Amino acid sequence: SQHADGIIFVGGGLQVPGHVDRLRRQVEAIEAEGGAVVMLAPNDLPWPSIVPDTDAGIAELVEHLVGLGHRSFAMLTGPDHLKTSVERAAAFRSALARHGIALDPRAVVSGGFERLQAAEALERLVEQGVRFTAVVCLNDQMAVGCLQAARRLGLRVPRDLSVTGIDDLPVTELLDPPLTTVRVPMRELGRRGMELVLSRLEERPFEAPTALACELVVRGSTGRVGRGSRKGER
């Protein structure tokens, strides 16, 4: 039979209902055979984890948008059962609250962490007359969909609408306009995960941080409020 000394689990599915119990059994079996397990995503499981600290990056993003004059926002979330989406949404709400800004409940919709679903969600918001000057997508895939939807709607980004994402996927700097986003240090996350696995196998202390800082990357998809037409002042 095949055997691995170390296993690294990644992805938001670590919290999917029905999957957690199966995952727990798998991890216990691996550890019973002397293997080491590390998690690289937000989770409530009792094993060592290294996770991206997106809260600080999201706070930077809000400071950036508020500094540009934005006060009315839409938020596109991921699936409710994914801890990644829940935590990012909470961080965004908290950062807005520090500026005395509350989200209009009508402006919070699920984009499913998917491009097409996010595009449809933005189109519905505009059709329903919900007012916002910036849309914050909780991952980059949804932001790509919003850029495509904005183009179909005749909204100029960023003159009429600012669009942001989270992750900093390689494609984001190639978009038109390039996407303002929060960079999640995936390469560093993987490297630290491997170091933690090896330290557990070798039974030595692991001294590196277990939460990795994320940073704001400002590109061309965000702009100052008031530059666009009334069509974009939503």
Description of each model-found segment:
Residues 3-8, 13-234:
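Bacterial carbohydrate/catabolite-sensing allosteric modules
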